[in-house]
């Protein structure tokens, strides 16, 4: 209702439901005349998918300062895939919050941190383990906006998918579990450029974002995907920052047309 001006705590102002719906329906989000943006990969001098995510995390830590922390398992040893190594190398060791092996606690800690006015980035180490944090994600984080009128600026990174030979619980594709929840923003970047842009933008949203990273795309095999392909790109890091500084949407909610045609497969 329009009378809702505070969240569940009185510490932070929250947008009204009307303001939020107006932002979602804003004409600057979706354009029916989007230009064709073909995918371009480079053999040298580009970033892998993992490198783009690492750089985005460092840039987010630099931008948000003390308001940003990174919460998850094995954080002190850079996580299961070394994704936190760039944060450590950039001097952000103190922002890494190591948690017990309990996804519910990890997500709830992120929610509490977000409600206090910070912008946490949470990691669920493998997709299958998101099931153990399902209640915290769906019945708590996702409901804060529409049930209590609260902001919950939290990004949840989730490595998922096959190509690790890690067995059950480590290869689940979980996007369908959460895609229909109206309180969650679900992102699944497919290229280094998309990964950088979407993670930067996600960190500026006032709602919980599930950021799904396919492990096979990381570039762990000599810079190539788990299928032996090169998807490395020279990543433009300026455009998304320009958009968020102006309060504009950059990629979230917009479709990229990468090839011409009449059918979607």
Please place each PLM-identified region on the residue numbering.
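Thiamine diphosphate
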Residues: 3-226
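Short, intrinsically disordered, charge-balanced linker/junction segments flanking boundaries
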Residues: 259-265
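Aromatic-enriched
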Residues: 218-256
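Generic preference for hydrophobic/aromatic residues in regular secondary structure cores
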Residues: 96, 255-258
């Amino acid at each position: 209702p329009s009378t809702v001006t505070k969240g569940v705590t009185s510490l932070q102002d929250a947008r009204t439901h009307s303001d939020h719906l107006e932002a979602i329906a804003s004409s600057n989000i979706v354009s029916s005349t989007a230009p064709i943006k073909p995918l371009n990969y480079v053999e040298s001098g580009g970033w892998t998918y993992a490198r783009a995510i690492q750089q985005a995390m460092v840039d987010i830590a630099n931008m948000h300062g003390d308001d940003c922390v990174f919460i998850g398992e094995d954080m002190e040893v850079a996580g299961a895939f070394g994704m936190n190594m760039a944060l450590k190398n950039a001097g952000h060791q103190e922002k890494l919050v190591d948690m017990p092996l309990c996804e519910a606690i990890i997500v709830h800690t992120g929610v509490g941190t977000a409600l206090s006015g910070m912008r946490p980035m949470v990691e669920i180490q493998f997709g299958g383990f998101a099931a153990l944090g399902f209640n915290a994600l769906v019945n708590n984080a996702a409901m804060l906006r529409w049930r209590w009128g609260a902001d919950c600026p939290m990004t949840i990174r989730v490595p998922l998918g096959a190509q690790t030979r890690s067995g059950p619980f480590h290869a689940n594709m979980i996007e369908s579990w959460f895609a229909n929840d109206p309180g969650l923003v679900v992102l699944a970047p497919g290229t280094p450029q998309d990964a950088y842009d979407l993670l930067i933008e996600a960190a500026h949203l006032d709602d919980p974002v599930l950021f799904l990273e396919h492990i096979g795309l990381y570039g762990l095999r000599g810079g190539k995907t788990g299928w032996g392909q090169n998807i490395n790109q020279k990543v433009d890091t300026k455009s998304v920052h320009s958009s968020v500084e102006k309060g504009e949407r950059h990629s979230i909610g917009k479709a990229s047309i990468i090839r011409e045609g009449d059918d979607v497969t």
